[in-house]
Design a protein with these regions (language model features):
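Glycine-rich anion/phosphate-binding loops
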Residues: 158-166
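Alpha-helix C-terminal capping segments
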Residues: 145-147, 173-178, 226
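A post-motif C-terminal structural segment
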Residues: 38-41, 46-142, 192-533
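Short, conserved helix/loop micro-motifs enriched in His/Cys and acidic residues
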Residues: 138-158, 361
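Bacterial N-terminal signal peptides
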Residues: 15-26
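N-terminal secretory signal peptides that target proteins for export/translocation
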Residues: 1-9
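Glycine-rich phosphate/pyrophosphate-binding loops
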Residues: 166, 171-172, 177-197, 525
Length: 534
């Protein structure tokens, strides 16, 4: 399989310029329109989940390409994920002006003619993958949470890192307007880029807490716990196995903040406990928090702050996924706990659920881990669907939307070797021994993987080797590929109407997901700037 390097198509780039004023007119609610029926948002994000990885997991779990829980949702689209860094790099090469929110050329961010108007999956079909530059999770999640493009590394903050550059998130605005409950759930630290972008603001995604490496500003954890105070927070970052001595140069939460959380008048804390079933604890904790009139905080995770990653087994005809430690809840259990809590709010709710370990697995080119992580996401989506289907409450498909997408793609996976993998099949996977040089920074969330992923020129050296060539990973970093969007329930049409407005085909921009949600929730069009407190 031949990999074609990125190139710029001048003719296409000149063809589509997006002017913000027009976009605002398009999405403005009509005068006199009745209040939207949408009250509940369940927003799933598979971090680093490309279309190729979805197909790979579906083949393993179901023996076909379209068996995942969301692949048959009525609303289907593709999403461009570029950020300001990607845009400006492409603009320089094309000798075009840098990004401006008031006027920009969408096709400078993602070149449809070179890379296609849909994700490419399969052997001969995968002839071009935009390996980089690519967005990072912080700027990608900011686009989803605020509707603003920004720089890599920014958490709901304007590009260029101006003072007072905070951007109001859709979760904050929805809570302010209606009293809705808001929550974030993740398998990675609760203040990592994707969940943090919906409930905090900082020009640096690495400012995990005040005092970290001498950081004097308001850290992400501090802002989440002490200022924004989401109704539900469930994620990793527990110091028990990650930073038990509270070394101020590492970890995700300071000692003072952790002790304050344990004694908090606002939150009921459910935390990882040796020998305890984390899933049972968080579900019971949700009920206890409701009874006590408190918010719910679930603090879990293992070494590195993440939930212990699951693994898929090579078991032809009988797929089998082994979960991580039971001391952490599964993503499905955490999702149910969050929904049980938020569903009691008569003002509605907005829940963001991230499967963050897909990204880690793809950074490591770990096919087995990737498949297992997507299997866990499938379980969580099914649990959420069952919650909405459950009779006897006010949450149903007439007032609830469930969407599944990715913040970006990672790993450049290519399917289509001599052998097509089927139900329960995994490729032979061996760790590489030697790494001749370090990889360049190409949008990777963490640069080198723990296994020492490396790039050589011109051949990429994956941290895992697939000697039978059933599959190929093209990078340890992020890519600028289109990712999938699947939507079901109330307000599906709001998302679908944006397809083809900025890009040909069924493509919409990640900021347009935010626009669709704003319109469906009755929040109105996004102005030039939506800074906090203004």
């Amino acid at each position: 399989m031949k990999r074609i390097r990125p190139k710029t198509n001048q003719a296409l780039l000149g063809g589509l310029t997006v002017v913000l004023l027009c976009a605002v007119i398009v999405v403005s609610p009509a005068c006199g329109r009745r209040a939207p029926a949408l009250k509940h948002v369940i927003f799933f994000i598979g971090d680093g989940m490309s279309a190729q990885t979805e197909v790979a997991a579906s083949r393993y779990l179901y023996g076909r390409d379209d068996g995942l829980a969301w692949q048959k949702f009525p609303g289907q689209a593709y999403v461009a994920t570029w950020d300001v860094n990607v845009y400006n790099g492409n603009a320089r090469r094309a000798r075009r002006p840098p990004y401006s929110r008031s006027s920009f050329t969408a096709l400078l961010g993602y070149d449809v003619r070179t890379y296609g108007s849909k994700p490419r999956v399969g052997g001969d079909d995968v002839v071009a993958i935009p390996f980089g530059p690519a967005t990072d999770s912080a700027s990608a999640a900011t686009a989803l949470a605020t509707g603003f493009k920004t720089d890599s590394g920014n958490i709901s903050w304007l590009p260029g890192d101006p003072p007072a550059g905070e951007l109001t998130t859709i979760t904050e605005e929805y809570r302010t307007k209606t009293g809705a409950g808001i929550g974030v759930v993740s398998t990675v630290p609760f203040n990592h880029a994707t969940p943090a972008a919906f409930v905090s603001h900082n020009p640096s995604r690495n400012a995990y807490y005040s005092g970290l490496k001498g950081y004097k500003g308001l850290g992400l954890a501090d802002e989440i716990i002490l200022r924004v105070k989401p109704d539900v927070v469930i994620g990793g970052g527990h110091p028990l196995l990650d930073n038990p001595d509270f070394n101020p140069r590492q970890g995700y939460i300071s000692k003072s903040l952790y002790l304050g959380l344990k004694a908090s008048p606002d939150y009921l804390l459910v935390e990882r406990t040796p020998g305890a079933d984390g899933g049972r604890a968080i579900v019971e904790g949700a009920a206890a928090a409701l009874r006590a009139g408190k918010k719910l905080f679930g603090l879990f995770g293992g070494k590195g702050g993440n939930f212990d990653i699951a693994q898929a087994e090579d078991s032809p005809g009988r797929p089998r996924v082994t979960s991580g430690s039971e001391e952490n809840p599964s993503l499905g259990e955490a999702t149910v706990a969050a929904l049980d809590y938020l569903g009691a709010n008569p003002g509605g709710f907005f829940l963001v659920v991230e499967q963050g370990d897909i990204d880690w697995a793809n950074h490591d080119n770990d096919y087995r881990g990737m498949v297992a992580c997507i299997a866990e996401l499938v379980g969580a989506v099914r649990a959420a669907t069952a919650f909405v289907d459950r009779p006897g409450d006010t949450v149903d498909w007439t007032n609830t939307v469930l969407l599944v997408t990715a913040d970006h793609a990672t790993g450049g996976l290519v399917l289509g070797g001599a052998k097509r993998l089927g139900l329960g099949d995994l490729p032979r996977q061996d760790p590489r021994v030697a790494y001749p040089e370090a990889p360049p920074a190409t949008g990777s969330d963490r640069g080198l993987s723990p296994n020492g992923a490396a790039l050589t020129t011109p051949v990429y050296a994956s941290p895992n080797v697939y000697p039978d060539e059933d599959i190929i990973f093209g990078t340890a970093g992020h890519t600028n590929e289109l990712v999938d969007l699947a939507v079901t329930g109330a307000a599906t049409r709001y998302f679908m109407k944006y397809r083809g407005t900025w890009y040909p085909g069924l493509v919409l921009d990640n900021t347009q997901i935010n626009s669709a949600l704003r319109e469906a929730l009755g929040l109105g069009a996004l102005g030039r700037r939506a800074a906090r407190g203004t």
